[in-house]
Amino acid sequence: MKQYNVTGMSCAACSARVEKAVGKVPGVTACSVSLLTNSMGVEGTAEPSAIIAAVEAAGYGASEKGAAQSSPSADEQQLEDHETPRIRRRLIWSVGFLLVLMYFSMGHMMWGWPLPPFYDNNHVAMGLTQLLLTGIIMVINQKFFISGYKALWHRAPNMDTLVALGATAAFGYSTYALFAMTAAQVRGDEAAVMTYMMDFYFESAAMILTLITVGKMLEARSKGKTTDALKSLMSLAPRTASVLRDGREVEVPVEQVQQGDEFAVRPGESIPVDGVVLEGSSAVNESALTGESIPVDKAPGDGVSAATVNQSGYLRCRATRVGQDTTLSQIIRMVSDAAATKAPIAKIADKVSGVFVPAVISIAAVTTAVWLLLGHPVGYALARGISVLVISCPCALGLATPVAIMVGSGLGAKNGILFKTAASLEETGRVQIVALDKTGTITSGQPRVTDILPAEGVTEQELLTNALALEQKSEHPLARAVLDRAAGLTAPEVSDFQALPGNGLTAVLEGKALWGGSAAFTEKRAAVSPDLQAKTEELSRQGKTPLFFGAEDRLLGVIAVADVIKEDSPRAVRELRNMGIRVVMLTGDNQRTAQAIGAQAGVDQVIAGVLPEGKEAAIRRLMQRGKVAMVGDGINDAPALTRADTGIAIGAGADVAIDAADVVLMNSSLLDVPAAIRLSRATLRNIHENLFWAFFYNAIGIPLAAGVFIPLGLTLNPMFGAAAMSLSSFCVVSNALRLNLFKLRDNRHDHKRTNHLNNENKEEQTMEKTLEIKGMMCPHCEATVRTALEAMPQVQAAQVSHESGTAVVTLTAPVEDDVLRRTVEDKGYTVTAIR
């Protein structure tokens, strides 16, 4: 997506006009314009020159965001609030002249304030003074007229058009009344003079412009605050780096750091670019990127990220990613892109905004005509029409969604939760089912020793020492768990080491044969006591892998290894279920291991034995029951992440640019999943509130201004209409800013949405059939049979075991035995019985 800066936009009608104009350019496949950030994202093959020309033809300005603007410091300067100071200056001058105008126009008549003798009974001089003061205020606020009439000329009227028409009508009619009064005074018609003098609306024109400027300033200040999170991220970017050149440290601008450069970071300094530690150790505070306040220990070989703070030790690092490739830059780009895209819910406001201003102009014209036809004076009828023009506010509609999206995505980024698009921020809160990959998501992804069971007469240290001697030459993933557990122990070198695939390990230590492996491998070498056998079977039921170790024909003991679940996983699952979300675990493990992990985590359903392509099929089946979010590590889960309604990559760390995911979680904590859903729901709720206020305001305000409620004694003059218009946008933006107070990790106020999926096992009539199958030899065979059976629409789940040679199928509707038999036998296996 190419990014552009757009100038000259003042309301939702402007952004809709630009979007429509660019959308017609050949080669443009998608266009999204953000009124909040005055930016535009365009996808397609169209040339930038053609896109800029289309924007200019629509009456606005555009420029491509170039490389010079792509550094965080340049982007930060671009986000600086330049608008508020300009509007403040306009407002100060406008208020100054307005006070003088109000003194002349109303002070003398209403409160008897003294006037210079020159104005005594000099009505023409009084009128000319008001005309002059109003003209000055109109010149000060000429932006409304230039923008409004320019948009009208391009047949794309906007909010400025409404203000300009209202102020022009009031000023024009007042000028006519002044000339008519002058003629009456020349004729000596005092009655006509007083009548025309009462038709002066100079103060209304000036007040409209001043009050709209007040609203614009409040809106600009509030809009500036919505980008605070993004600006705070940009401010984290270090400006300089201490690069090692010819053995000396040289301080250079961070933009000059090249990939492969070595740089030094002292305690208390920010790390300038992404890199890898070459020398030194330290604790690094990564809260700026992940939201996690606990420092992370770094040693040689560990990665470090830009904008994180070195707290305790000296580090020498090599730059691996610089400039726009750093983690910080990618996060900033994600937040900016999310703000530049549009949420699906915004389409409602966009459709209304496209016809809103022309409709309001028509209503104002009809209102004026109706009151004239009813016999009211021109001034009265014109006041009603002007009120309609100045109270109508397309800005409130246009800002309702983008301000909430900006605040929500910024708040997420500060807490390590990155939404790639506005649509992902909206859709995440609507999920009904969360599918969790087991390894690295529910579990740590790193096998650890959980139990040590020495045989009778063997000490724990003796068992660990022999296991260490054997495993230190192994490359098996489970060997790392044993080595970590035996850290601090020393073991002699073994000889004649052999790794027997699928069986175990053998070696010779001091003339004795050492061995280690599975239960089947052990049966041929040593006897296992009934007590130890019972304990290992219990460990297997818990999803742990027992490793048997022995010397010669003697069993030394058992070490159990497992990919243990993270401490916060059960709590995260519990929070998801309390939010009314069904939690499903997907894993390639066998059914027994998967069920054990699933029980510890507390999930609603376990789908085991699925390969990456099987996970994608499982997601497709789950999507038939509701909106699904898939949570995985973004590596082998890419097909499932892409298939799901919302793909969530967890524990991304520095690899934030995961293409398959819609949401990226910087931490490895599963608690960020309910936090992301909670934030999405709060943002969506805020958008609904904003849209309700915007529609309600216009639905009530326009009829009130037109005089529909005058029979009930309710009327509205143009000045109050302008004040209401000014406050409407301010209220919408202020409501969005309330999101900054939202505690996205506080589950005390979670609302449990009604979700029949969590009760489906109680409500759904199910039946089970057991298939006896020959030919299954391994977990891969289990996965093949399970995938084939669960692809059937009537099959809710299939539990397959190659050890027992059975498949237990849970059905939601009757299926003929021959159909089940054929489904399995088509995969090359034999069904001997179905019961």
Regions found by a protein language model. Give the residues of each.
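Conserved catalytic phosphorylation-site environment of P-type ATPases
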Residues: 289, 348, 383, 396-470, ...
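Conserved cytosolic catalytic loops of P-type ATPases
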Residues: 26-49, 200, 231-325, 422-467, ...
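Transmembrane helix-loop-helix hairpins at the membrane interface
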Residues: 86-240, 351, 718
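Juxtamembrane coupling segments of multi-pass membrane pumps/enzymes
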Residues: 181-184, 190-191, 206-267, 298, ...
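Membrane-embedded alpha-helical bundles of multi-pass transporters
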Residues: 110-124, 153, 172, 411, ...
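Conserved ATP-binding TGD loop and adjacent catalytic N/P-domain core of P-type ATPases
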Residues: 16, 29, 267, 431, ...
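Flexible metal-binding regulatory segments at protein termini and peripheral loops
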Residues: 1-125, 223, 232, 248-251, ...
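ATP-driven catalytic headpiece of P-type ATPases
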Residues: 89, 308, 429-475, 503-584, ...
